[in-house]
Amino acid sequence: EIQAIRRDLHAHPELGYEEHRTAQIVADRLEAWGIPVVRGLGVTGVVGIIKNGTSERAIGLRADMDALPMQEINGFAHASTNAGKMHACGHDGHTAMLLGAAHYLAQHRNFDGTVYLIFQPAEEGGGGGERMIEDGLFERFPMDAVYGMHNWPGIAEGTFAVVDGPMMASSNEFRVTVRGKGAHAAQPHRGIDPIMVAVQIAQAWQTIISREKNPLLTAVLSITQIHAGSATNIIPDEAQLVGTVRTFTTEVLDLIERRMQEMADGIAAGFGATVDFGFKRKYPPLVNHTEQTAFAIEAMRAVVGPDAVNTNVEPTMGAEDFAFMLQAKPGCYVFLGNGDGDHRTGGHGLGPCQLHNASYDFNDNLLPIGASYWVRLAETSLPVA
């Protein structure tokens, strides 16, 4: 049944804050299993509530529901039927695993306390986790800790990976406009060339990473777009630098943002140009908490054995908006290995089975493993006296 749900969700992907069908399926299933449901938290989010015993302790288990704006090239039976939309990050599987756990917990209730089942919208850049928090997630559903999980291609099928402390990086965007003075390209002395100034700024910024930041603290500053000009014989009025900054600590991020602006302003002023400096902090670093990570490791080892749990995985510079929940509550986020793609049925797109790839598919062999982890985590965190 859970596999059928997963494949149905894969065939009907919905983008962030558009997960109406998905949320309806989730809520209907939970209610059919006798689980009270709150709908519409954070626009399309769903929270299920399973109580047992008399303890006031509570934990949250979170799964994301949204898809990506991509055209799937797989040709198997459960491929996307919605043009330009695809579950290329496995959120269909995340939703299904939490539903599987919900069904078991509702039937057996071998815990003392409350388990909140958090089905989150809009993880893919929409900030759905933050939106649910702003909509009262932790006030309306008070919990002691919150947990998340993500499938991870390249890690052996059915193995877990986690690290105490920083697990994923912050995600930040900058958009910096250099304003000069346009001129004929044959008479550059009559203008102020914003392209030349922008290039100087871009080169200087990289010294923040190589010469100003502590080399033991990881960070990335990538310029991914440069926009300027419209003709070969015109020096434009402005040039724009766009890109991303990733860090594992806010202290390093503070340094980078401050020095980027100082360098941009100073270099531009030296050439008679000006700068409009835009820097947006999107997702904070995802940092696991020690006590909850220990609970998670205990639960993972109980499900797959100690040899299949890597507790020293290398953090990734990718970002996750579950970080907002871990800022508000203690908790832990883990990776569950999706394998190398051998699980895909015939008719797949022949490309790599990587996240955000048009040939990706979630590994259904993970469904019982992920669901069992959620169950074990609930029973470990909320033991019956």
Residue map of PLM features:
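Histidine/acidic-residue-rich, glycine-tolerant segments that coordinate divalent metal ions
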Residues: 46, 68-70, 74-86, 92-93, ...
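Metal-dependent amide/peptide-bond hydrolase catalytic core
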Residues: 32, 199-385
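Active-site pocket-shaping loop/turn-to-helix segments
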Residues: 12, 189-195, 251-257
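Acidic/His- and Gly-rich active-site-bordering loop/insert found
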Residues: 1-87, 96-99, 103-111
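Hydrophobic face of alpha-helices
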Residues: 2-3, 20-27, 98, 195, ...
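Divalent metal-coordination and catalytic microenvironments
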Residues: 9, 30, 48, 61, ...
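Non-cysteine beta-strand/loop elements that form the S-adenosyl-L-methionine
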Residues: 62, 71, 174, 334-338
